[in-house]
A protein has these predicted regions:
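Bacterial N-terminal signal peptides that target proteins for export
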Residues: 1-12
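Short, solvent-exposed loop/beta-turn-alpha elements that line the ligand-binding surface or hinge
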Residues: 54-64, 217-221, 290-300
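Pocket-lining segment of extracytoplasmic ligand-binding domains
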Residues: 104, 127, 167-170, 174, ...
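Short, glycine-/small- and polar/acidic-enriched structural segments
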Residues: 28-175, 191-197, 213
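Bacterial signal peptide processing site
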Residues: 24-26
Length: 333
């Protein structure tokens, strides 16, 4: 078991290499395939559903090959997009913001929302952790440094005067893939974790964890973008028709999920099992996951810009919301 190696600073290095001044790149060309990235998470339910039902492939037609790229954290997905290995993807707002700024706005844009909510702080069995205030001196996992849950955790800590050890504080923030977090909770090697669904619900059931903070309680009206849809700018410029068709498929899956969560949940569970080589999610885990996650394409721009402000405040970025005028493209909605 290993923690994920790619983090915010490797992302920054990658950007410098790819977007340095004077760096030439080939002109955008019409595509005969599209690489779609997403996570095996409930917050990416629309992607899981569209992939499993053939929605993406049907939308673009037989002449365009749809290839799936599966990730467990956003910074690694952004690195793949920088390397032109991803064209269209589902990701948390944190890595999308980082990628946009580090590429001087050249690499990507957000064109829709995929989920609101669906992230929480949980504590390992037997730990006396009732709130974020109790994390001092504790070992807390996030999917990846610089990712959306990492930013949320560090912001919550800073708000009460705490910080990670890497910033001179006492909280040991470590990065692990969610599946590894489950094993570490079972072995008692972690105190807490800030994770997306279905891992929150699964670890509560399978490892006896307790829910400490549902992140929705920290946001106005309980709404914030947990997952957004991004597109590689060069791909979108050369293939606006493909992007429009994929967005139609995305929204169709969002609508299908909300129309019948039981049926859609079964499809999504099987897809997660297929991708993670694990078992399907039980009905109670699915129900709990969906109860904390709103699968939606509602515009939640303010929350995305708030993540930018938080990332700046944490020292991840040099600019806050004022540096992201072209990040969210409503014209592509």
């Amino acid at each position: 078991m290993q923690s994920i190696r790619f983090g915010f600073w490797s992302l920054a290095s990658c950007c410098v290499a790819l977007f340095a001044a004077g760096c030439s790149k080939p002109a955008p060309t019409k595509a005969d395939k599209v690489r779609i990235a997403y996570f095996p998470n409930i917050t990416h339910a629309a992607a899981l559903h569209a992939a499993a039902t053939g929605g993406f492939q049907k939308s673009v037609g037989g002449a365009i090959k749809v290839e799936e790229r599966v990730f467990t954290a956003g910074p690694a997905e952004v690195e793949a997009l920088f390397a032109s290995e991803v064209d269209f993807g589902y990701i948390g707002p944190g890595p999308a913001i980082n990628g946009y700024l580090k590429s001087n706005g050249q690499a990507l844009e957000i064109i829709d929302v995929a989920a609101s909510g669906g992230a929480s702080l949980i504590a390992a069995k037997g730990r006396s952790i009732k709130s974020v205030n109790d994390l001092a001196g504790k070992r807390v996992a996030v999917p990846q440094t610089g990712g959306t849950q990492d930013i949320s955790l560090r912001h919550a800590l800073k708000a009460i005067g705490l910080a990670g050890k890497d910033k001179g504080g006492t909280v040991d923030i470590v990065q692990y893939a969610p599946a590894d977090v489950l094993d570490l909770f079972r072995r008692g090697e972690l105190d807490a974790a800030w994770l997306p669904e279905p891992w929150v619900s699964r670890i509560i059931k399978d490892a006896g964890a307790t829910l400490v903070t549902d992140e929705r309680t920290l946001w106005p009206k309980g709404k914030f973008a947990t997952a957004v849809v991004i597109v590689r700018k060069d791909f979108a410029k050369a293939n606006p028709d493909i992007v429009a068709k994929l967005l139609t498929a995305h929204r169709a899956s969002v609508d299908a999920i909300n129309a019948d969560k039981k049926s859609a949940g079964s499809v999504i569970s099987k897809q997660i099992a297929k991708l993670s080589q694990g078992k399907t999610l039980s009905a109670d885990i699915l129900d709990a996951s969906f109860s904390r996650t709103d699968i939606t394409y509602e515009a939640l721009d303010e929350s995305v810009l708030t993540f930018a402000d938080w990332a700046k405040d944490l020292g991840y970025l040099k600019k806050g919301r004022d540096g992201f005028g072209g990040l969210i493209q409503h014209g592509n909605r």
